[in-house]
Structures are given as structure tokens and as C-alpha cells.
Amino acid sequence: MIKKGIRIVNSKIVYYVFAALIFVTVFCLLGERGYLLWKDSPAYLAFDGRTGIVPIYPLFLQINRMIFGEELFLYAVIVEQTILTVICILAFTEFIRKRFRLSYLASYPVLLFSVFMPFTTNYPLSISNHDIMTEALAYPIFYLYMICFLKFIFDKKYKDLVIMVLVSVILALIRTQLQLVGVFNAAAFFYVSWMKGRKYPLGRQIMQAVLYVFLSAMVLLVGEIMILGANSAGQRLIAAMNKETEVKEMVMAEEGEPEAETMDEPETETNSIEQVEVQPETASVKVAETSGSNMTEQYGHLIIDKAVYEIDEDDYLLFEEEELQKLCMKIYQEADEERQRYVYARNDLWMWQDIMNGIGSGTSIIGAAWNEYLAENPDTGLTYSAINQIAVVLLKEHLGRVIYHTLRMLPQGFICTVFFQKEGVYLLCHLITLVIYVSAIVLAVWGYRRKDLNNQYPEFLLGCIVINICFVLIQSIMYFAMQRYLVYCFGIFYVAYYLTLKEVFNRFWHGRKKGRIKFGFWMVSQKKI
């Protein structure tokens, strides 16, 4: 009876029916039933090429607005996001199932891990496919990137590198922070080149390693050039579409017709938001005309935010010019009034939260301080660029503290990649995360040392470990380690962990038989995949 039940569950029809039920339940029934607007959503709806917002998602929203109209387009958006999410998850799980020759029974955990994270990060409030946020596209397309990434490191064919770089460019044009995927490309290239050259003597391998480092840097550089060029083209397209809309509105106004309503709602929503994630209150929202400018300018804003968090009362003495001293004092006063300075951070495991909130408030603090300074000094010769000058000086002065606070954000960043954070047992969350990562590294080393195990298992797991480490380090240093920035590889990591752990279980508890490993109905061929 039990064997018959297992055979039924192991059938193709049951597996895909189960997958359909999971997709409908998670992406249609859980969380917000309609669309959900977040604090940053108006910035994407505004369609004005502002700082830090790359073109794909605003274009995606605008095209839907043009096709379906103001009242329906957001509903069309969530339908399309849902379809894309399902397609990308299916593509990834099918790639894994076929690549590792899994039975349908063995594929259920792969499906479940892939579905639930990162898409349920904000549950019960929402599931990502219902959010009007870049993650609604970035999360599923990252699964497509991982297919390309894994195929490249598994097959070690340089032609796969081209497709991988192209998909990484698409990701970077959805969300600025995903430029870091170029680092994954470079790491994968180095790994493949190193593994292909292991047949040579050690001395030659070392010499080649230097060349591989240089070529990896070239891969990173080429990808970045492609990203900046594509972003520039996208911003010009946004500017052209905006200009066309303005011309139509002027013509309609001259003809005595009511003004077009297509842009009213997002403008109203944008004005009702005091601060969005990537747009300073005082910064221009003019479409960038130069290559990648609205991407590179974002790093300047983040430097300012970190500098504001570290400011001290006597830092105005670092400047000789009186006007700069006045502005610096205004910034300090505003930051101190808002209690968004390092001195107000808790000195415990939750310190990262205060650091993140403080850095995230930098834009609004700067805006308020600048406005107060202008009100008191209307004849000043300073321009807003003086803020950058102050920020650079503050960062140099407090560099050690900046590094320390960055390090304090790292532990929670690693927790976000593989586990959850609960206040009552937060120390336990740290310990569990440490155990997960240490055990994953042990499994990867074990996999490489086993001559009878296909290298795909440890390569998959090690790749996920490296990706998570890069996510945490780069996001913490360049941005700040918010959970939704770090969970891209959450479910994929556990897929790799599960596959490798299953092989450990097979070998230590069931042995071998005629070139095949027997684990009930979990049959996995040990021939070259």
C-alpha cells in the first residue's frame, strides 16, 4: 500500500498537478489579492528617469499603462508578473530535475524551496508578484540567470558566458543594486578557467591564475559598460516618450479638450511621498542625458547618507569656509534632532537595525538641513554640490567608524540569506545561520573530495555560498543590507544544500548497487551527467 502511494506521488501527472496547486495557492491566494503599492512604488510610476531608477521596470509599467489605461494597467501588471514568476520557477526546477536526473518524488523539495523564497519575503502582507516593485521582475529573472550561471560552471563552455552576461545586464537594468551580478560573472569565469587549466603543472597553473584574474576583471568591465550603455539608451527612450506625451497634452489643451489623465495619478502619489528609497527630496528628477548618470549618481547619495550617520557635533571645525561650517552644523542639528546618528544605536545584536534606519534617513535629513540653511542664508554662494564636499570630508574623518558599522551589518545580512530573524531568539538565529553555512562548506568540500560524485553537486552548493557572500558584502558596503536586497538566492541555496545532503545520505546509509545509488524511489544515476 505504501509502495503504491509512493508510485502515485512519483508520477509525472501528480507532480505537475501539485506544482499547479502550489503556484495558484502561493501566487494567487496568499497575501494581497490585488496590487500593492509600497513607499517606492510612486518613483517607478512617475516615469521620469530619476536618480537610481533604471529603465526596464518604469518602461514595463508605462507600456502597460498605454495599453490597458489608467484604471486597469496595474491589474494587468500583476497578472504579467505572476505569469513571469511561474515560468521562471518552472524553467529553473525543470533544469535542476533534468540536470541531476531526479525522480519526480525527489523533485518536490526542489519545487517547494524554489517557490517559497524569496517570493514570500513580505508574507503575510504580500507575495512579491503582487508588489509594484522591481523585485517582482528581479526575483524571477534571477532564476533565469542562475540557470545560465549553473550551465556555465557545469559545462565549462565559454559560449555560455555570453548568455550569462546578457541576462545579468537585464537584471542590472531592472534594479541598480544588481550590478553586483557582474561580480558573479567574473567569479564564474575565473572558476571555469581555473578548472579547465588544472591538467597543467602547478607552476603553469599559478601563472595562468594571474591571467585569469585579469580576464575576469575584463568580464566585469565589459558587463558594466554594457549596463551603462543600455541604461543610457533606456533613459533616452523614457525622455522621448515623456516628450511625446507632453506634446499630445499641449495639442489637446489647445483644442479645448480636457488634459490627458494618464500621468495624473502617479504624480499625485509621488507628491504624497516625502521620501522614496532612491530619490533624495532635493535632487533633480530630470532624465539623465549622459551614459549611466542616474545610476552612478546614486552612489554619491549613498556616500552622503553614510556620512550623515557618522557626523559629530564638532565636525564643522573640519572646514575653513564659514558657509560650509554653517551647513555642516545644520546637518548635525537635523540628524541629532531625528536621533539618526550612531550615538543613538543600540549596543546589542539589533544594532544593525538602527544603523540601517540611520543611513536610510540620510536623504531626508540632508534635504531638511539644506532647506533650513537656504532659509537662513538666502544670499549664500553655496550650491547643493557642497553637500558632496562635506560628505567626503566626513567619510575620511570617520572611516574607521564607517567600516565598523558596516561590519556590524554583516551578521544579520548572512541571516537574511538563509534564515529568519526573531527577536526573542535572535542569538539562536545567529547560531543556526552559522551552523547552516559551516555545514554547507563541509558538504561542498566533501563533494569535491568524493571521486565517485559528479562535481555538479559541490559546484552548485559552492556557487550559492559564494553568491550569498557577495550579496552580503557588496550590499552592506555599497548600500545597506535590507532583507529584500539579499534573499535572491535563498531558495536556490536550499535546493543545492538538499541535493548534496541527499547524496551524503545515499552513500552513508544505502551504499551502491551496479553503478546506481538506491534510496527507495529516489534513484539518481552516478554516470556522467
Model segments located where?
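Extracytoplasmic catalytic/substrate-binding loops of multi-pass membrane glycan-assembly enzymes
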Residues: 30-45, 49-64, 68-72, 383-384, ...
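Membrane-interface transmembrane helices that cradle and orient dolichyl/undecaprenyl
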Residues: 143-160
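Membrane-interface alpha helices of multi-pass inner-membrane proteins
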Residues: 161-175, 212, 216-220
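Membrane-proximal stem/loop segments at transmembrane-domain junctions that anchor or position
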Residues: 231-410
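Loop-to-helix entry region of an early transmembrane alpha helix in multi-pass inner-membrane enzymes
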Residues: 59, 69-90, 108-111, 427-431
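Aromatic- and kink-enriched transmembrane "portal" helix at the membrane-lumen/periplasm boundary
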Residues: 55-58, 74, 78, 111-138, ...
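Membrane-interface anchor segments at the N-terminal boundary of transmembrane helices
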Residues: 75-84, 376-377, 381-469
